[in-house]
């Protein structure tokens, strides 16, 4: 894109959302590393530590993993089996991409639904994770992340379907 062309509103919004996602991921990762390092120093230097630090670090691992999965799903950057790329003809590869993306979207939708049910149960239960932070709040990333991933893969499957239709003779 040359510098005289203007990006559309949706392209600018998408770019901003990607930057927000990246910033959240970096912030979570830095917080996780900072908390772990702080805990190590406190234990080794003062023989004391933050009581809820280990629990927070475990929760941050969950959040970093799921936000990282959201980031990876932007362009369909997931674990793939390269055998399809090597041996399938171009049209068959497009069909395989569509099937994989649609299947991924459906599975993520199911996981999002059942994780939402789980978070609702945790909300009803009222348990605390640490320092008066409720369990459900720590687990809320699960349905959110899988919903975002499902939506992205539904969009990717629509794009792949259009490519299949356009490439037909």
Regions found by a protein language model. Give the residues of each.
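Alpha-helical transmembrane segments and membrane-interface helix-loop junctions
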Residues: 1-169
């Amino acid at each position: 894109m040359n510098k005289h062309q203007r990006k559309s509103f949706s392209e600018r919004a998408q770019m901003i959302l990607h930057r927000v996602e990246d910033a959240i991921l970096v912030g979570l990762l830095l917080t996780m590393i900072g908390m772990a390092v702080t805990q190590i120093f406190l234990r080794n230097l003062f023989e004391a530590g933050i009581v809820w630090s280990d629990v927070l670090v475990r929760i941050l691992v969950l959040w970093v993993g799921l936000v990282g999965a959201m980031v990876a799903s932007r362009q369909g950057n997931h674990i793939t089996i390269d055998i399809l790329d090597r041996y399938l003809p171009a049209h068959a590869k497009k069909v395989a991409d569509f099937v994989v993306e649609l299947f991924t979207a459906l599975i993520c939708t199911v996981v999002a639904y059942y994780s939402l049910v789980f978070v609702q149960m945790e909300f009803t239960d009222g348990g605390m994770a640490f320092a008066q932070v409720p369990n459900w709040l720590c687990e809320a990333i699960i349905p959110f992340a899988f919903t975002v991933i499902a939506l992205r893969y539904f969009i990717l499957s629509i794009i792949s379907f259009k490519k299949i239709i356009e490439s037909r003779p």
